[in-house]
Amino acid sequence: MTKRLFTSESVTEGHPDKICDQISDAVLDAIYEKDPQARVACETAVTTGMVMVMGEITTNCYVDIPKVVRNTIREIGYDRAKYGFDCDTCAVMTSIDEQSSDIAMGVDKALEAKVGEMSEEQVQAIGAGDQGMMFGFACDETPELMPMPIILAHKLTMKLSEVRKNGKVKYLRPDGKSQVTVEYDGDKPVRVDTVVISTQHGADVSHDTIEKDIMEHVIIPVIPRELLDEGTKYFINPTGRFVVGGPQGDSGLTGRKIIVDTYGGYARHGGGAFSGKDPTKVDRSAAYAARYVAKNIVASGIARKCEVQLAYAIGVAKPVSVLVDTFGTAVIPEEKISELVNKHFDLRPAAIINKLNLRRPIYRKTAAYGHFGRDDAEFSWEKTDVADALRKEAGL
């Protein structure tokens, strides 16, 4: 078989772009706690000593956005000036408008309802909030039905955060990144070739200490021993120093880590970010639905690998296209799989929202360490509750 290497990265919750994603989703959650019918498109930018929150929000409730921002930054861990960013002293500016009435008229009532093809009662008759294409993916490389490189990368950054917050490695700071290169034999992952960890740290710790502690407390507990060998390469803070980090080191923006959020580059991406968007925005809800479809297909045993593309027109409820690609791993014809998808999954925006129960304040948790491959109860798109029906109808 042909051997090849594939690499994915993850970032910690203290990475500047991820700070922005979490603030945007924390604002969405705060609004959804009071008004689950709100329309929210919230963007955030951070830089040294400053946060800017902007966007289009239509709601009947009041949310103290600066308070939400400061609480989010505090929970991430930037609560002291010596970390380069302080939740209590940073400036917070807001610029919020209502959703455009031109967009709202298409979301409020789908084209199908306007021309009599769908009644108001049919799945609330709302249209897609924008045009675009979204991808969902699943494969049998890991128990999470995700590609191995991104799962390992996320587990490393989650462990980095854990040992920082529980005090096991006291000198760690919130900003950090991981990168994992996996060697494949054909399409099977067989070993980890390279691990890269870069973590912000206090100024008074030696590089040797950091290398030792990260190996002992982060890498060894996370990467399965059978995937490591004498040829595995480790790069821990390879620049030699990472004291200046977070918004002091780099500015951050919502939506700049879309590959980290999804499949680590292993599957295609439609380009739309998730955080700060309510589920009438198909960038988010349809990407979740596409993952739900793909994961149930793989969980059913119909295919070992599956990618689903959905595409929408603004103001129109039904997808303009649905494509299922199993990369030659399916045990039944793909035409049959497409029939099963059309039968078992309603992919109109309001149907997705209802099926996955998306009008809930569940989004802050999604904004770090990946939107997919998680077993948290709130991640309804990770359920495999359609797999049995698909398996039965496929005759497996």
UniProtKB/Swiss-Prot annotation:
Binding site for Mg(2+): 17
Pathway: Amino-acid biosynthesis; S-adenosyl-L-methionine biosynthesis; S-adenosyl-L-methionine from L-methionine: step 1/1
Cellular location(s): Cytoplasm
Cofactor binding comment, as recorded: Binds 2 divalent ions per subunit.
SUPFAM superfamilies named in the record: S-adenosylmethionine synthetase (SSF55973)
Cofactor(s) the protein requires to work: Mg(2+); K(+)
Binding locations of L-methionine: 56, 99, 250, 281
Residues annotated for K(+) binding in this entry: 43
Keywords, in A-Z order: ATP-binding, Cytoplasm, Magnesium, Metal-binding, Nucleotide-binding, One-carbon metabolism, Potassium, Transferase
Stretches for region Flexible loop: 99-109
GO cellular component terms, semicolon-separated: cytoplasm
Signal peptide span: none
Root EC class: transferase
Enzyme nomenclature, EC number: 2.5.1.6
GO MF: ATP binding; magnesium ion binding; methionine adenosyltransferase activity
Residues that hold ATP according to the record: 15, 175-177, 241-242, 250, 256-257, 273, 277
Its job: Catalyzes the formation of S-adenosylmethionine (AdoMet) from methionine and ATP. The overall synthetic reaction is composed of two sequential steps, AdoMet formation and the subsequent tripolyphosphate hydrolysis which occurs prior to release of AdoMet from the enzyme.
Subunit-level organization: Homotetramer; dimer of dimers.
Membership in a protein family: Belongs to the AdoMet synthase family.
Listed name of the protein: S-adenosylmethionine synthase
